Amino acid sequence: FHANNLTRALITGLGSMTGELNVTIENCTFVSMAPAAMTFFDLNPKNTSSFHLVVRNNLFSGVCEVGQGTWFTTRNVTSKTFENNYRTNGFVVANWGVDAAEIPVETTLPMETLFKDVAGRDFTITDKNSEVYTNGIGDPHWIK
């Protein structure tokens, strides 16, 4: 998934959800080419009986101005699992919205080196020795 001129979060609108809510974000590649204040995930249900969140084996990358952007906003989380998530070297947001241990691990390579053709939206992993490739992180479509 790549975001270009996105003005809302990638996942949002959970405010009116009721009952048990399970959200799993797994084996995805997210590349933000969006405005500076982009939010990746706005997960704020108000009336759920339980909210279980799993975020694992994802790759996050893109362009974000210093001091801008949010990774997660969450509310009323019953349980959460964050594991094996990575971000390309140099990709940061102002507000990760999670505990320090849950922030994605920074890769050795920046997106321009890790991906085949960022401008052409070809996010094939070019370095077969990179931690992203060897650990199978992100969308399997880009790990060839």
Each model region followed by its residue ranges:
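Active-site and glycan-interaction determinants of carbohydrate-active enzymes
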Residues: I125-K144
